[in-house]
């Protein structure tokens, strides 16, 4: 008897405690310290995990709840849950500190059928949403009655707020032509080909760089939105015969996929039907289009404009599409705390990191367009919560985040009305920032270090070099007290941008070309790395050329600059080292050497070993423009460059009289340069264009080999 009692006692002793596990499953298994933040702890969030599960022993609590609420109906329980959720939402609002405006955080997100519109304190929707729960309950009951009357009126008068979107499904009257949707379905590739384009895109370094759309969601939309026809006996593939959307007609899901297809298939020509479809989607303006897919679609369109080299050279063709992207994103609250704002509306948690990253890229694009066009940034500081961005950006986005904020701050100083910017100090701070945050330029100029994963870093480096070059030019134009270091920055920053462009172009071409020699046929028509290099060339090469030519023109026209350069020229010949954008200390770099270095950059691309790559130059419109601009500049400035004196052989020779004599000797040739400029560059167009521009067809043929 005693043995039985002892055995039962041991069993009771071995029972585990009902103490809940506080750490999430991931941290508990890997023995990591869990901060227990929900819905994602710090460890899971930093690793971009899609799940963060907490296993809790709640059996005792469940028993108590069952006893307490066993007589409650489901309706009463649902109402109680809504009240408690509302209280939790209000409690989660950030505490209002003394002196802080309580209205600044008064936000209401109206969500309906996956459409989201954000309202602020002066909106009646936000005011009503802050009322008591009892008032909200009665408001819903009143709205249901009003909604019945409204729907009856709509049916009687044949009115629909979806008429704008529905127009895409209707053929123009008396035209005999198909509707936009019918035309689109006729022009789309087979379903399997479209699926392959999407798969290629999500496997590319380009997608890894941006990650603004959720891969699994897009692939689900692919299955849900397209209706496949019968399988072709010839190809074994299915044609797309129609689209399958819900009653709210979110065509932006399809737009995201067709925009991705355009990016993945570049440089193949985009069918006219897809271009028309994209233009129509872009033109919608009613409140029925506030889908997150609309913001993604507009930004993907912006990316394609840059990938195809259609930005106008200075982002001027991107201004309106960028404005639409900003307006839609802000009115949907993408600049807010999405993890609090959207989770209360049952928005999928796995999509929120992509929306946060999308807003971060929109901020960077705003700076990029502002820098290129010379206009202040469009996104006001009120929409940029710096602390929130720093908390929620993943480790891969930190460089993008910090570079964007640094460049935004510089643009703010440039356009300030009250205080002129201290340009030398700004340039020095930006140089220190690049040293701290970036790998050195030498790293990216070494082909062995490039594998395609550095695409984001290259974009940020180019933007930083553009800013340094622009500020240096501005200082030279607006200040009489010239500075040798500033002058060197203005020459070497765009030169290094050109070095970076063409080194990446050559290296990425070799990366793709090495795959072509393999037996894999699917890679024989794909140039993913080269397309990324073209993106950098289109956006940065033309701009760098113009910056360098601006320096040459300043020298030709401004005698003060001529005198300053002659007085501060280095006694020893200074050879330009790619990767160095500072130059000799307290001495001006020779313009002759800079001009020769630029010639070497462009001559290198025409070497025999790069002959396959030069075919791109011969058949691309944008490349032809760049080549022609360089040839025109080479011929126009070559005469002036020959007459530039290298400066005094010793510092003792740099007297005022000798400098005046040098400038007088230069005056004649420079006047000849100005008077005979047109004669110098006139000639047969073939002297500048390697071939007649024949559109993109030949360019496409080259890539399809």
Curated annotation (Swiss-Prot):
Q: What does the record give as the DNA-binding region? A: 24-52
Q: State the UniProt keywords alphabetically.
A: DNA-binding, Metal-binding, Nucleus, Transcription, Transcription regulation, Zinc
Q: Which domain of life is it from?
A: Eukaryota
Any one cellular-component term (Gene Ontology): nucleus
Enumerate the subcellular locations listed in this protein's record, separating them with semicolons: Nucleus
| GO BP annotations listed | DNA-templated transcription
Instruction: Kindly indicate whether the keyword Transcription belongs to this entry.
Output: yes
Asked if the keyword Endoplasmic reticulum belongs to this entry, the reply reads: no
- A GO molecular-function annotation: DNA-binding transcription factor activity, RNA polymerase II-specific
| Classification via Pfam families | Fungal_trans, Zn_clus
Protein name, UniProt field? Uncharacterized transcriptional regulatory protein YKL222C
Taxonomic placement: Eukaryota, Fungi, Dikarya, Ascomycota, Saccharomycotina
